[in-house]
């Protein structure tokens, strides 16, 4: 049970990334990958619930720490994605899971804002992992567009606004304030919010503003380029739970490119759409390696396998 108490918070966002990637593979026809990942994530979620109940004091301590606290939002994101899976077998239960997860996430946003913005502020803990809290709620728009949940459009507009509010301040912070090694990999999270905005907007909003879509996808491309340039430095570190910062952003980036390719095709820009589709293929190739690497290393940590 000690291993359960020590289960790192970043396992949660790692599985959000793995679940998202499994949906990509399912779209390619590899449905078993999706089923296996969904069941594995369900086990991890149950284990984390046990940790919350049995080791409440440990979890409260983690929640008081700004960076882990921002990542706790991934708990709700896992529930949302699992809800979309359950929805296929039981629409009422699946939809309820998504709605409950959104409510929990909204409460988390309020708590996080009070503790880390209103009550006190620390530029050293102001990192891209904050986007997991503030934009992670948009996962509901990624997976729930066909569930008939009326409030999703409000989440889309909230997510886009909060992204444009935070990202310039975040860029300033990354340029002007030293990033500590312990949180270095959270820089990769900058790809997640803009990708979520693209996917959510194209999924939920009927009358789309093409200029807004292009601007958001330009942010995706810039963020992706930033991560690709940083990859050698990211992997220069010995593995630690912070590597989870690379997982979901890269996975949702694939979905954003696929959605953008569809949008461009509908706009009559087949040539550019084909290029974006090929980019999505490259993203899938790189992301599979990254998520596989992180998952394998978490297994090694969990089983206490001695490294040679």
Please provide the spans of the model-predicted regions.
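Helix-coil boundary and interhelical linker segments in multi-pass alpha-helical membrane proteins
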Residues: 23-32, 84-95, 142-154, 201-212, ...
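Generic multipass alpha-helical transmembrane bundles of integral membrane proteins
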Residues: 100, 130-224, 229
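N-terminal signal-anchor module of multipass membrane proteins
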Residues: 1-49
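Juxtamembrane helix-loop boundaries in multi-pass membrane proteins
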Residues: 1-20, 56-83, 98, 114-142, ...
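Membrane-water interface at the C-terminal end of transmembrane alpha helices
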Residues: 110-119, 143, 172-173, 227-229, ...
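Structural signature of hydrophobic alpha-helical transmembrane segments
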Residues: 33-46, 91-106, 150-165, 211-222, ...
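C-terminal functional regions that serve as terminal interaction/effector modules
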Residues: 26, 45-47, 220-227, 246-308
């Amino acid at each position: 049970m000690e291993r359960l108490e020590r289960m790192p918070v970043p396992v949660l966002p790692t599985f959000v990334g793995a679940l998202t990637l499994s949906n990509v593979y399912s779209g390619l026809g590899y449905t078993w990958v999706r089923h296996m990942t969904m069941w594995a994530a369900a086990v991890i979620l149950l284990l984390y619930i046990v940790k919350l109940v049995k080791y409440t004091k440990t979890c409260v301590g983690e929640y008081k720490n700004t960076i882990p606290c921002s990542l706790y939002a991934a708990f709700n994101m896992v529930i949302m994605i699992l809800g979309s899976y359950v929805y296929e077998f039981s629409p009422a239960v699946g939809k309820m899971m998504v709605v409950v997860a959104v409510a929990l996430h909204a409460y988390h946003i309020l708590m996080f804002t009070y503790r880390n913005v209103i009550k006190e502020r620390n530029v050293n803990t102001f990192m891209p992992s904050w986007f997991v809290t503030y934009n992670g709620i948009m996962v509901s728009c990624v997976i729930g567009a066909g569930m008939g949940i009326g409030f999703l459009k409000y989440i889309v507009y909230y997510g886009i606004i909060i992204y444009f509010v935070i990202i310039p301040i975040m860029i300033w912070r990354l340029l002007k304030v030293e990033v500590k090694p312990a949180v270095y990999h959270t820089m990769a999270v900058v790809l997640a919010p803009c990708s979520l905005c693209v996917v959510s907007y194209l999924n939920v909003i009927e009358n789309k503003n093409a200029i807004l879509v292009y601007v958001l996808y330009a942010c995706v491309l810039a963020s992706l380029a930033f991560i690709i340039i940083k990859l050698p430095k990211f992997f220069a570190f010995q593995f630690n739970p912070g590597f989870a910062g690379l997982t979901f952003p890269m996975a949702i980036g694939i979905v954003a490119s696929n959605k953008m390719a569809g949008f461009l095709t509908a706009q009559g820009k087949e040539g550019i759409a084909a290029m974006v589709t090929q980019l999505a293929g490259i993203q899938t190739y790189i992301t599979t390696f990254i998520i596989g690497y992180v998952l394998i290393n978490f297994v090694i940590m969990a089983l206490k396998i001695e490294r040679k």
